[in-house]
Curated annotation (Swiss-Prot):
One of its GO terms (cellular component) is cytoplasm. GO terms for biological process: chaperone cofactor-dependent protein refolding. This is Co-chaperonin GroES. Heptamer of 7 subunits arranged in a ring. Interacts with the chaperonin GroEL. Signal peptide: none annotated. It comes from the Bacteria.
Amino acid sequence: MNIRPLHDRVIVERQEVESKSAGGIVLTGSAAEKSTRGVVLAVGKGRILENGTVQELDVKVGDTVIFAEGYGTKSEKIDGKEVLIMSENDIMAIVE
């Protein structure tokens, strides 16, 4: 994949979530929950502050993150893979 996000944007590949209920029923369609976990594939250079300096991002390529899929999150298909483009502000945690 050859994509470079700008500024504080991050490219995330969503991780698959278990598609079975606790009772073993396979969930499909709207009953299947979308995961809010993913792996960071690419990061921008950083957030531009008011004084013009660039603040490096906290997340790095390869980090597993938990994110909020909000208004600014964009879903794109790149090289046959569905990825999410979001601001670092939409990332709530890094899973360690």
